[in-house]
Structure formats: structure tokens, C-alpha cells
Regions:
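Single conserved hydrophobic/aromatic residue that forms the stacking wall/gate
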Residues: 1-10
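A short glycine/serine-rich beta->alpha loop
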Residues: 4, 17-23, 59-68, 134-135
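Active-site cofactor/substrate anionic-group-binding motifs, chiefly glycine-
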Residues: 14-48
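Alpha-helical scaffolds flanking conserved acidic
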Residues: 21-35, 97-103, 162-173
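Acidic, Mg2+-coordinating active-site segments of isoprenoid diphosphate-utilizing enzymes
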Residues: 41-63, 72, 76-87, 108-129, ...
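Transmembrane helix-loop-helix
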Residues: 86-106, 225, 232, 239
Length: 254
């Protein structure tokens, strides 16, 4: 699971990478946090992952009931777009705001997060090969990081060519993040993660670890994160903190 606020950090750092200095990205940071939280609330519902704990606390539906879990998730998604619309009041460059909203709508909808989640549900308990697993991961997790980093870039005035590089880097970061999640599910503790471990095995989920083993999965995480750093460095724009953030994926414990 992407940590609370991590997408915001990627968005802010990418915004600053391309010279953004004002508050234009802030409504989008808040909106992405709402969209991410909406996805987690719904993921935890009995109809999907049926998880009781998230971030060390009881999940929304365990505290407030299943109906409120559904409604609060939808409310957050709706509120996210209300908040993004407020960005029109912060700039004369309306085209950048429109472009950012289009990216988020695309990356979190059927072509991204929700599409990946749907394919994941349809294949629950079925044997999967690398190609299908990559598709699910790229859409469920990478799409959120792509949305965060690409909106940061476009709001700061990145070119189409630069935006493509950011998209590729973010895809690598997202895949690395999700594979590291698979590794932590079998190597970490519930106290460290703040949620039950071995949940993938319990739910008969195919993961990178179940396909290739933890050592090979760890090598893949390093390969993907190294490639992401190379892509970002090739932009000839320096943000050492962003590089450090990507590299920390390899060693994270939660």
C-alpha cells in the first residue's frame, strides 16, 4: 500500500523539479490523497480484500459499517474533483489545470486504477503469468504515482516529451513499490506494516514473490528503481531528494 502522503511528496518534488514555486499543485495534492484513500476504503470492503486493519487501525467498514464504507469512499472521490476545480482560482493558465485534471481522471479511472482493480478482482484465485500481473500492478499502483508525478510536471509547464519521461519513471516507481509490498507481506511483521501479514497467501493471490521468490523480486525492485532514477536524471534537471525518495523504495520496511 502506498504510504499516506507519499503521492503528495512525489507530486511536490516533480513540481519543483520543473521549476514550480507557487501553491498551484496543492489542490491536486489534496485531491490525490482523497482518491487514494477512497481506493483503500473500498479495497478493504468484504466484497474485495475483506481486511480488518489498515495503518494499524480498524478499517472504515469495521468501525462504521459496510454501507458507510461504500458511501465515504464515493464521497471522497467526488470531493477530490471539487477540490481540483478550486485550482482555477489560483492561475491564469487554465490549460495547465485542465491538463492536470485530465491526467488524474485517466490514471484513476477505467484506463488506470479502477481498471486494474477490476482485472485483479476478475482474476482472484486464478493462476497468473507475469504479463497479467504487470498489467494489474501498472494500473492499480503505478497509475496513482504516474498521476501524481505527471500532474506535478504539467502544472509546472513540462513539455510533452518531458511528460513522457516522467510517466515512464513513475511507472517504474509504481511497479517497484508494489513488488516491494509483495516482499514485505512475507518478510515483515504486522507491527511494522500496520496491517496483517501473509494476506496475499491467505487470499490465494498471485504475487511476484509467489511467481519468482523473494530474492528475485528484490532484484526486480532495485532494477526498476535504478531505471527510474536514470530516466529522471536524463531530464537534466536536478532534484536529489526525488532520487533519494526513489532509491529508498528498496529498503523500506512498511
Amino acid at each position: 500500500e502506498m504510504s499516506r502522503g507519499l503521492g503528495d511528496v512525489y507530486k511536490r518534488q516533480t513540481y519543483e523539479l520543473f521549476g514550480g514555486k507557487d501553491k498551484l499543485c496543492e489542490p491536486f495534492m489534496a485531491a490525490m490523497e482523497m482518491i487514494h484513500t477512497h481506493s483503500l476504503i473500498h479495497d478493504d470492503l468484504p466484497a474485495l480484500d475483506n481486511d480488518d486493519y489498515r495503518r494499524g487501525r480498524l478499517t472504515t467498514h469495521k468501525v462504521y459499517g459496510e454501507a458507510m464504507g461504500v458511501l465515504s469512499g464515493v464521497a471522497l472521490l467526488n470531493r477530490a474533483y471539487e477540490v481540483m476545480l478550486s485550482a482555477f482560482d489560483l492561475t491564469e493558465d487554465k490549460d495547465r489545470v485542465i491538463a492536470a485534471m485530465r491526467i488524474i481522471a485517466d490514471k484513476t479511472g477505467i484506463n488506470g486504477m479502477l481498471g486494474g482493480q477490476s482485472v485483479d478482482v476478475e482474476n482472484d484465485g486464478k493462476p497468473l503469468e507475469h504479463k497479467m500481473l504487470d498489467y494489474i500492478y501498472k494500473n492499480k499502483t503505478s497509475a496513482l504515482i504516474e498521476a501524481s508525478m505527471m500532474t506535478g510536471a504539467v502544472l509546472a509547464g513540462a513539455s510533452e516529451k518531458e511528460l513522457k519521461v516522467v510517466e515512464q519513471a513513475a511507472e517504474n516507481i509504481g511497479l517497484a513499490f508494489q513488488i516491494q509490498d509483495d516482499i514485505l507481506d512475507v518478510t515483515s511483521t504486522q507491527e511494522e506494516l500496520g496491517k496483517p501479514i501473509h494476506s496475499d497467501e491467505k487470499n490465494n493471490k498471485v504475487t511476484y514473490v509467489s511467481l519468482v521468490g523473494a530474492p528475485a523480486a528484490a532484484s526486480r525492485v532495485k532494477e526498476l528503481s535504478d531505471h527510474a532514477v536514470e530516466l529522471l536524471d536524463d531530464l537534466d534537471r536536478k532534484n536529489g531528494f526525488l532520487d533519494l525518495l526513489v532509491e529508498s523504495l528498496v529498503s523500506r520496511r512498511k
